[in-house]
Amino acid sequence: EASMLVASLSEVSVFTLEKDTFLPVSYRFSRGGMGKSKDIEMDFDWQQKQVMGTDRDQSIHIPLNRGMLDKSTYQLALQHDVAAGKTSMSYQVVDGDEVDTFDFRVLGEERVRTKAGLIDAIKVERVRDPTKSNRKTVLWFAKDWNYLLVRLHQIEKDGKEYQIMLKSGEVDGRQVQGKTE
């Protein structure tokens, strides 16, 4: 959860893990303030094989197939798959009343700079169809810290760049500490 002076954001996923398969149960997203409010509620009914809910007051009702994830749980599945040594990953992600395919590939190992120091990481890129999007996203997962996402670099269609970098953190009761130069 994050909150700013004039805006708020909350994203919550409930899921189960069944033999290395993430099964979403519910997904809630709420953003308020700055004139861009958005509310999403989705429930994943595995017995009825349906995703039901609302996205910006529009009803969602789509068939649910094994392997489908919400917009938060796929990130955990990606982290899990990188930790398992997979090099090419594809996820079916429910986005409103559609199901999008998110593809990723491992680019290799790299020592990456973060606010917590230099971290040995696995570098992963989001694979997009260049005829549909020139947006680029690269992620780094820390090898020695349970594959925690420690850095993300995104270049938008308009060329604007964004970077998210780990400042501090704790994994299994230990303070995340990178190497010094």
Task: Identify the role of each PLM range.
Residues 36-81:
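Hydrophobic, well-structured mid-protein blocks that either form specific transmembrane helices
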